Amino acid sequence: MLKLILIRHGETQGNKLKRYIGKRTDEPLCPEAGNMLAQLAYPEVQAVYASPMIRCTQTAGILFPGKKLNIIDELAECDFGEFENKNYQELDGNEHYQSWIDSGGLLPFPGGESREEFKRRNVTG
């Protein structure tokens, strides 16, 4: 039986600042993230697939050194649209952000993807 293990990338500077870091912001891992990831142990795998984002390829390379990395564009993170690379403090007072919050995150990101579009793209990959 095929077993699929999904792993989120290690921490980036934008993550530390609680920013919406998605498809439009290609930033590397923080130095300490690499050290933390290197201490983790994962089972032997047959194949490694990753988003083309540098933080994802770095994470895969640290966790599975020596394994061929298969890049799948459709696995890239969500397109946060006008929220990209901003945190909740910077979005305070933004009517689109407040509408999105009030919807429980169900509305599409303004200028970005909806949850359904993001899911469909990832599943296609």
Predicted regions and their residues:
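Active-site-proximal alpha-helix that buttresses catalytic centers in soluble enzyme cores
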Residues: 2-4, 8-67
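Solvent-exposed, charged/polar functional surfaces in cytosolic regulatory/catalytic domains
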Residues: 39, 124-125
